[in-house]
C-alpha cells in the first residue's frame, strides 16, 4: 500500500513553492531578456504557435507551423486548414472528408498528458487494449488497436509506443479511409501528431508542475533564429516523476528534443532528434465478474499484480524534412524518419479468478530485450496548375516503410494461487527468469513500397472533384520460437482508390461525399490458421462543414464502413492466437465543433454515434466489436476575462464534460464496460512581470467518478480504470 499521504502532499506543496520561486526569479532576471525588438506578446504568440485574436483589437493572421513539410494552422481553438487530408495545404471546407484538429491552445488549457487526453475532444474515438497502459491504442469509427500503424508523427509512421509528449504541437485526425495517401490503415482513419518546429521569432518557456498524486515535472521550450544566419533552432526538454494513482507505481520519463531549420530562398530543411527514457507501470487494471457483469467490489486503487509490474525502455527518433519550391506552381516535399524503441517489462499476470473466494491465479511473465525500429520515406510533388482552363491541385508521390519488431526473451513461469483480491498481500510471487524457448524470438518484419497520385479538380467556384489511387506492395514475415518457426510469409500488391466531391453552397458552407477502399496485410507470430488473408474495406461518407461567424468550424458526417477478414485475438489452451472474422461493419454519425463564439468565449465539442458489429462469423455474428463505444461526447468551454482592472494581469477559466457509452468487454460480449461522464475544469492567472508568469490549476474528474476506459478483449481479467480526481498546478514563465 502507498504510505505517507501527508508527506506526499507536503512534498507536492514544496514542489509548487520551489517552482514559483524559481520561475519568478527567471521572469525578473534582466540577463534573460532577449532582443528588444521582440515584444513579449510576439514571443508568446510564437511559443503557442497561434495568435489569440482577443489579445488585441484586431484579428491577426495566424502563424503557420511547418510540420515536416505539412502546412497547417489553427486560430485559438479553431482549425483553419490542414495538410493531413490531401498532403497539400487545403482549407477544411474544400476536403471531402471529416478532419478534426486539437490545437495547441486546447492541449495547454486542458493540460493534456497523453494522446487519450487529446482525443477525448474528438467524436467517434474510443480506447482499445493499451497493453497495460504501455501503448497508444485508439479505435476510430469502430476500428483500431495497439500497434496498428494508425498513429503517425508529422505524417510518417514510427516505432514509438506513445506518440504524445512535450514536442507535440497539435493532433490532427483524418476520419475514414486514408490508405490512398498513407498506405496500410484501417477504414476508421488515422491520427497525425504534429510536432513543434523551429520558429524565426524568439520565444521560450520554462515550467514546472505538481500533481496531487505526488511528484511533478519540469521542462523548457526555447526557439528562435540564429543571429546572422538563415538558421532557426528549437530545444525542448522535460523531466517527469509522478506517483501512480493506484497503491503502488511511479511514472518516470525524461525527453530531450533539439531541432534545426534552414530557410533558403526556395528551400527549407528541418532536422530534428528526440530521445526519451521511460519507466511506467504495467497495469492491466481490474477484473469484471461474469456472474454479475460488474467490476469486482474492491477499491479501484488496489492492484492485483506486483510492484515489479513495470515497463522500462528508451526511444529515439531522427527526422529530416525538405521543402523546395520550384516556382509558384510546383513544390517538392521530402521526408524521412528513423525511429527505434527498446524496452523490457515484468508482470504478475492474472490468469483466473474465483468469484466465490476472491482468489486469483497468477503467472510471473516478462518480456526482455524487445526492440522495434522503423524507417519511413516519402516524396510528394505538389502542383497547383490550370489544365483546360480548370484549376487542378495535383499530387504525385511515393513512399517506403520498413518495420522490424523483435521480442527476444519471453519469460513464463508456473501459475500460482497465492493472492486474494479482498486481502491483498504482495511479495509472494517473485519475478521470473525462466525463458520459454517456444515463445521467444517473436519477430515480425514488414516492408512496403507505394506510388500514388491525386487530383483536386476545381470545376467551378462551388464544385470540387477529388480522385486518387495508390499501388501498395508489401512483403511480410512473422514467427517465433527457438528454433524459429515462420507462421506468416506473404507478399503482394493491390490498387487502393478514393474519390470525393465537394459542393460549396457559400464560402462558409460546404457539402461533401466520398468513397474509398482500404487494404491491410495481416500477420501472426502464432496462428492455427496459417497465413491470414488481408483485410479489405470500403467506406462511404457524406457530410457538411460550416464556418460560423468567422470563428467556429463545425463538421457533421454520416458514414458506413465494411471490412472483411478482420483479425482478432482468442485464447486457446492459455495462449493467445489470432483469427479472422468474416465481415464486420461500422456505421455512425459524428458532429464536431471548435473555435470562438466571441472574442472571450471559446469551445470545442463533439458527439459520435457508432454502431459496430460482426456481420458474418461462425462464432460472433451479431456481436458488438470490443471496446467500441456506441456513444461518445465531449464539451469544453473557456472564457478569457482579459486584462483585469488595468493591472495587465489576465484570467482565463474553463470547464467541460467528456464521456462514453457502454462498450463490449469481450469478443463474445459476455460483459460490458459501463458508460461514464466525467467533469474537468481549469483556471489560469497570468502576472505581468518583466516576463509573464502564469499559474494554472487543472482539476480532472472533479466528482471522482469510477470509470473504465478499455478492456484487453480476450478475457474479463484486464480492464483499464480511468484516473480518479486529481489536481495539477503548473507555474510557467514565458520569454
Identify the residue ranges that each predicted region occupies.
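Structural signature of Gram-negative outer-membrane beta-barrels, strongest in the C-terminal barrel
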Residues: 261-263, 372, 391-403, 442-563, ...
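Acidic/polar loop-and-plug regions of large Gram-negative outer-membrane beta-barrel proteins
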Residues: 240-244, 257-325, 340-372, 415-444, ...
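Membrane-embedded beta-barrel scaffold of Gram-negative outer-membrane proteins
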Residues: 323-337, 341-347, 504, 511-512, ...
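Acidic, small-polar-rich N-terminal luminal/periplasmic segments of exported/outer-membrane proteins
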Residues: 61-201, 542
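Outer-membrane beta-barrel translocator/receptor signature
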Residues: 167-169, 180-258, 262-268, 316, ...
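Conserved C-terminal beta-signal and adjacent last beta-strands/turns
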Residues: 370, 394, 540, 626-735
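Surface-exposed extracellular loop regions of Gram-negative outer-membrane beta-barrel proteins
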Residues: 277-294, 402-406, 475, 498-541, ...
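Gram-negative outer-membrane beta-barrel transporters
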Residues: 560-562, 580-666, 732
Amino acid at each position: 500500500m502507498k504510505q505517507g499521504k501527508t508527506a506526499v502532499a507536503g512534498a507536492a506543496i514544496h514542489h509548487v513553492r520551489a517552482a514559483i520561486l524559481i520561475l519568478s526569479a527567471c521572469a525578473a532576471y534582466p540577463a534573460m531578456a532577449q532582443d528588444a525588438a521582440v515584444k513579449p506578446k510576439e514571443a508568446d504568440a510564437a511559443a503557442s504557435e497561434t495568435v489569440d485574436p482577443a489579445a488585441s483589437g484586431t484579428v491577426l493572421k495566424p502563424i503557420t507551423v511547418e510540420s515536416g513539410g505539412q502546412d497547417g494552422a489553427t486560430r485559438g481553438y479553431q482549425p483553419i486548414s490542414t495538410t493531413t487530408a490531401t498532403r497539400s495545404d487545403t482549407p477544411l471546407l474544400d476536403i471531402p472528408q471529416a478532419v478534426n484538429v486539437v490545437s495547441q491552445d486546447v492541449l495547454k488549457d486542458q493540460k493534456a498528458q497523453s494522446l487519450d487526453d487529446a482525443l477525448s475532444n474528438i467524436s467517434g474515438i474510443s480506447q482499445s487494449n493499451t497493453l497495460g497502459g504501455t501503448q497508444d491504442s485508439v479505435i476510430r469509427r469502430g476500428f483500431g488497436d495497439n500497434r496498428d500503424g494508425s498513429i503517425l508523427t508529422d505524417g510518417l509512421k514510427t516505432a514509438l509506443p506513445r506518440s504524445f509528449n512535450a514536442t507535440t504541437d497539435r493532433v490532427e485526425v483524418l476520419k475514414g479511409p486514408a490508405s490512398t495517401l498513407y498506405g496500410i490503415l484501417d477504414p476508421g482513419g488515422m491520427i497525425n501528431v504534429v510536432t513543434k518546429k523551429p520558429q524565426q521569432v524568439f520565444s521560450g518557456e520554462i515550467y514546472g508542475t505538481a500533481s496531487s498524486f505526488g511528484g511533478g515535472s519540469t521542462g523548457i521550450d526555447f526557439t528562435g533564429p540564429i543571429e546572422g544566419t538563415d538558421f532557426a533552432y528549437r530545444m525542448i526538454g522535460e523531466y517527469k516523476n509522478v506517483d501512480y494513482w493506484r497503491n503502488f507505481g511511479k511514472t518516470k520519463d525524461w525527453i530531450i528534443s533539439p531541432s534545426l531549420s534552414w530557410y533558403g530562398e526556395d528551400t527549407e530543411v528541418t532536422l530534428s532528434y528526440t530521445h526519451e527514457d521511460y519507466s511506467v507501470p504495467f497495469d492491466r487494471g481490474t477484473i469484471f465478474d461474469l456472474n454479475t457483469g460488474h467490476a469486482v467490489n474492491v477499491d479501484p486503487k488496489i492492484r492485483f499484480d506486483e510492484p515489479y509490474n513495470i515497463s522500462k525502455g528508451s526511444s529515439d527518433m531522427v527526422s529530416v524534412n525538405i521543402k523546395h519550391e520550384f516556382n509558384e506552381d510546383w513544390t517538392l516535399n521530402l521526408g524521412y524518419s528513423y525511429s527505434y524503441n527498446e524496452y523490457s517489462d515484468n508482470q504478475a499476470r492474472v490468469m483466473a479468478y474465483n468469484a466465490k473466494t476472491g482468489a486469483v491465479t497468477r503467472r510471473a511473465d516478462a518480456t526482455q530485450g524487445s526492440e522495434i525500429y522503423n524507417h519511413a520515406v516519402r516524396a510528394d510533388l505538389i502542383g497547383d496548375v490550370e489544365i483546360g482552363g480548370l484549376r487542378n491541385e495535383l499530387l504525385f508521390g511515393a513512399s517506403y516503410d520498413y518495420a522490424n519488431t523483435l521480442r527476444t526473451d519471453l519469460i513464463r513461469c508456473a501459475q500460482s494461487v497465492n493472492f486474494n483480491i479482498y486481502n491483498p498481500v504482495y511479495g509472494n510471487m517473485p519475478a521470473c527468469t525462466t525463458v520459454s524457448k517456444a515463445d521467444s524470438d517473436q519477430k515480425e518484419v514488414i516492408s512496403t513500397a507505394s506510388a500514388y497520385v491525386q487530383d483536386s479538380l476545381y470545376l467551378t467556384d462551388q464544385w470540387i472533384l477529388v480522385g486518387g489511387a495508390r499501388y501498395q506492395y508489401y512483403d511480410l514475415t512473422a514467427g517465433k520460437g527457438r528454433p524459429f518457426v515462420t507462421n506468416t510469409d506473404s507478399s503482394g500488391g493491390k490498387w487502393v482508390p478514393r474519390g470525393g466531391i465537394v459542393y460549396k453552397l457559400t464560402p462558409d458552407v460546404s457539402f461533401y461525399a466520398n468513397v474509398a477502399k482500404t487494404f491491410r496485410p495481416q500477420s501472426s507470430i502464432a496462428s492455427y490458421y496459417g497465413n491470414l488473408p488481408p483485410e479489405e474495406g470500403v467506406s462511404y461518407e457524406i457530410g457538411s462543414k460550416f464556418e460560423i461567424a468567422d470563428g467556429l468550424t463545425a463538421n457533421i458526417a454520416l458514414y458506413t464502413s465494411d471490412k472483411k477478414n478482420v483479425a482478432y485475438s482468442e485464447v486457446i489452451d492459455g495462449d493467445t492466437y489470432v483469427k479472422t472474422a468474416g465481415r464486420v461493419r461500422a456505421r455512425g454519425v459524428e458532429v464536431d465543433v471548435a473555435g470562438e463564439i466571441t472574442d472571450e468565449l471559446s469551445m470545442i465539442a463533439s458527439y459520435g454515434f457508432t454502431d459496430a458489429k460482426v456481420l458474418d462469423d461462425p462464432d460472433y455474428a451479431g456481436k458488438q466489436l470490443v471496446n467500441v463505444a456506441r456513444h461518445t461526447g465531449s464539451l469544453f468551454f473557456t472564457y478569457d476575462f482579459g486584462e483585469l482592472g488595468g493591472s495587465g494581469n489576465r484570467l482565463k477559466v474553463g470547464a467541460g464534460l467528456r464521456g462514453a457509452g457502454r462498450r463490449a468487454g469481450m469478443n463474445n460480449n459476455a460483459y460490458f464496460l459501463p458508460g461514464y461522464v466525467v467533469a474537468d475544469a481549469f483556471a489560469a492567472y497570468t502576472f505581468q512581470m518583466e516576463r509573464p508568469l502564469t499559474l494554472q490549476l487543472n482539476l480532472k474528474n472533479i466528482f471522482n467518478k469510477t470509470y473504465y476506459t478499455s478492456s484487453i478483449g480476450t478475457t474479463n481479467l484486464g480492464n483499464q480504470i480511468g484516473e480518479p480526481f486529481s489536481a495539477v498546478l503548473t507555474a510557467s514563465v514565458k520569454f
